[in-house]
């Protein structure tokens, strides 16, 4: 047994995009300690692209831009898995569909969407799952340190 005591604990990890994702590294670390990991990904398309990587792991779709999908995820996880011991929110999004622009050219709607998905969704997830969390559960968010990045590298995501 490790000092983390994660054996037989159950976690929801949100945001696996590929095998290089921080969320995937967290999955591997949790599983190595004996934890059960449930996943949520943004879309059915993403789920399909991750089929081989995810194997038999429980994986659900949830686009956190839509609160009703967060509520539906909590309901489904509760029905299939019961309580959970922690949530890892490793989700970030920025609309770069028009290409990378200078920071000062960021549109308000794009900045607010990025903030809603990348940051505020943590609040909505915690609220939706509060009845499923064990008394000693933890909810964590993974982000970048804006002291180590510049607007040139991350565009308007740097301050988020």
Where are these regions (language model features)?
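Catalytic loop of short-chain dehydrogenase/reductase
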Residues: 15-22, 92-160
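Conserved hydrophobic beta-strands of the Rossmann-like cofactor-binding core
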Residues: 10-12, 84-92
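Canonical Rossmann dinucleotide-binding motif of NAD(H)/NADP(H)-dependent dehydrogenases/reductases
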Residues: 3-38
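Residues at the C-terminal ends
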Residues: 28-32, 79, 134
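Rossmann-fold cofactor-recognition segment
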Residues: 54-68
């Amino acid at each position: 047994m490790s000092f983390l005591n994660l054996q037989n604990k159950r976690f929801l990890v949100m945001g696996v995009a590929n095998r290089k994702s921080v969320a995937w590294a967290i999955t591997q670390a949790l599983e190595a300690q004996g934890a059960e990991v449930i996943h949520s990904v943004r879309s059915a398309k993403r789920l399909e692209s991750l089929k081989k990587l995810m194997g038999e792991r429980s994986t659900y779709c949830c686009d956190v831009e839509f609160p009703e999908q967060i509520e539906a995820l909590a309901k489904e996880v509760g029905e299939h898995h019961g309580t959970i011991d922690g949530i890892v929110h490793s989700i970030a999004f920025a609309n770069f569909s028009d290409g990378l622009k200078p920071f000062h050219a960021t549109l308000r709607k794009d900045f607010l969407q990025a903030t809603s998905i990348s940051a505020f969704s943590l609040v909505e997830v915690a609220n939706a799952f509060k009845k499923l969390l064990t008394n000693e559960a933890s909810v964590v968010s993974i982000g970048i340190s804006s002291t180590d990045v510049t607007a040139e590298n991350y565009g308007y995501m740097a301050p988020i």
